[in-house]
């Protein structure tokens, strides 16, 4: 028999259970670990905040230094380049350009930015621009600044020039809103009907006399062979003075239509009328006043209701209640509508002709020469075609256009537009041609 001692363990080892005296030690260790973690988190957060604060302080330090340098350069520039300017005005310009610089919307080139601001201020005074707030003035300056760069970077080798004008503070969106799409007429005059109009004109001695001047010739052997090439109605008194529709009313449709009727009476009746565009803006319900319209509906209005004189319904550029003159009215007898090459070979021969062109933001800055720049994709501006010519140095042919943007735009209010002889030609100028007609000589 084997005797087993009862103090020897049998089977698996026994699990050691912590005594009550070891629990406080573990709790203390956990607290120490937590405190260390909190301390590390605090130190890390403090470090990040300190680094961020240092970065912010550094940014503002250098920004402040940059603004200070900008101001110093501006003061130096204005004192050396504008010595005759009133000191208080010089200080005002410096303060304003520094304030604009602080917005971050202009460059650090104090000299050029200051020059632009001074030119902008002269522009504001010249065109009587009004700004309701500093923010609005800044926004207009930034737009002016953009057009300023376009003008200054325009290549002198181009056959046309650009310059700042009353449109220079209009954004592209604002300018586009003034010139909505012009829909071409849906029906056109038959060539047989147009031939009747042409034969009537041949019976008018006033017309024949002015046609010779427009063509630059002393004798016309065969009237049927006369075309619009080298014909310029502006050589005669058949073109009424340039007018200005303003920079806040899209009324080119009314101005071009009135211009054509004024020319018609000068050319066939030898009467110098000044007629009312404002009546068309107010009363032609087929159009939208200052929001755009169609020359064809304007001429239809004059045909059916007549139009008042400018002195009785003067132009304001604001849509007002329709109150035309009751007594004094000028009428037309009919309307001719042609397209394509018939516009130059037939329409223009009868009289200055209403056409549509697709203008762009560049054309608004045109100041002279033969415009060969980009055109828009759709007709959006109605003008009066008064002639066709050629530059004898380059051989480039061009259209002569009477615009409604005032005498201080383009070539005393006129535009020479490149003639390409391709399709509907430059800017779609041959898409349609409208002529008012008088039957009686």
Swiss-Prot record:
Question: Where is carbohydrate linked to this protein?
Answer: 270, 345
Top-level taxonomic group: Eukaryota
Question: What Gene3D superfamilies does this protein map onto?
Answer: Cysteine proteinases
EC numbers, comma separated: 3.4.22.-
Name of a matching Pfam family: Inhibitor_I29
Q: Which GO terms describe its molecular function?
A: cysteine-type peptidase activity
**Gene Ontology BP, a term:** proteolysis
Keyword Cytoplasm part of the UniProt annotation: no
Disulphide bond pairs: 249-290
Q: Which residues are catalytic?
A: 252, 381, 403
Keywords assigned by UniProt? Disulfide bond, Glycoprotein, Hydrolase, Protease, Signal, Thiol protease, Zymogen
| Family recorded in the similarity comment | Belongs to the peptidase C1 family.
Q: What is this protein called?
A: Cysteine proteinase
Question: Whose protein is this, by species?
Answer: Theileria annulata
């Amino acid at each position: 028999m084997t005797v087993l001692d009862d103090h020897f363990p049998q089977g698996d080892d026994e699990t050691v259970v912590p005594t009550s005296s070891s629990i406080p030690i573990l709790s203390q260790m956990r607290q120490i670990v937590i405190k260390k973690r909190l301390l590390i988190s605090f130190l890390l957060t403090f470090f990040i905040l300190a680094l961020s604060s240092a970065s912010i302080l550094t940014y503002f330090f250098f920004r402040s230094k940059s603004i200070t340098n900008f101001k110093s350069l501006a003061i130096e520039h204005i004192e050396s380049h504008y010595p005759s300017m009133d000191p208080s005005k010089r200080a005002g310009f410096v303060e304003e350009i520094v304030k604009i610089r602080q917005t971050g919307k202009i460059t650090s080139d104090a000299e050029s930015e200051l020059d632009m601001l001074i030119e902008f201020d002269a522009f504001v005074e010249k065109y009587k621009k009004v700004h309701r707030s500093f923010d609005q003035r800044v926004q207009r300056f930034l737009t002016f600044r953009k057009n300023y760069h376009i003008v200054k970077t325009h290549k002198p080798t181009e056959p046309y020039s650009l310059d700042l004008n009353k449109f220079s503070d209009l954004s592209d969106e604002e300018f586009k809103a003034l010139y909505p799409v012009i829909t071409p007429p849906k029906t056109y005059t038959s060539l047989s009907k147009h031939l009747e109009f042409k034969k009537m004109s041949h019976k008018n001695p006033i017309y024949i006399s002015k046609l010779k001047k427009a063509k630059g010739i002393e004798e016309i052997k065969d009237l049927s062979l006369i075309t619009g090439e080298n014909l310029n109605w502006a050589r005669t008194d058949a073109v009424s003075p340039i007018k200005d529709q303003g920079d806040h009313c899209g009324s080119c449709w009314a101005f071009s239509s009135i211009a054509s009727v004024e020319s018609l009476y000068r050319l066939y009746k030898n009467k110098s009328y000044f007629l009312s565009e404002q009546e068309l803006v107010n009363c032609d319900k087929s159009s939208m006043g200052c929001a755009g319209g169609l020359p064809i509906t304007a001429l239809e209005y004059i045909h059916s209701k007549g139009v008042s004189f400018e002195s009785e319904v003067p132009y304001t550029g604001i849509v007002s209640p329709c109150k035309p003159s009751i007594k004094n009215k000028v009428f037309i007898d009919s309307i001719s509508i042609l397209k394509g090459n018939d516009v130059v070979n037939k329409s223009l021969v009868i009289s200055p002709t209403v056409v549509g062109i697709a203008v762009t933001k560049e054309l608004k800055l045109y100041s002279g020469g033969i415009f060969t720049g980009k055109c828009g994709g759709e007709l959006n501006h109605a003008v009066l075609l008064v002639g066709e010519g050629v530059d004898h140095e380059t051989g480039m042919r061009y259209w002569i256009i009477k615009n409604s943007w005032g005498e201080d735009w383009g070539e005393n209010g006129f535009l020479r537009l490149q003639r390409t002889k391709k399709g509907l030609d430059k800017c779609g100028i041959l898409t349609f041609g409208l002529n008012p007609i008088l039957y009686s000589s």
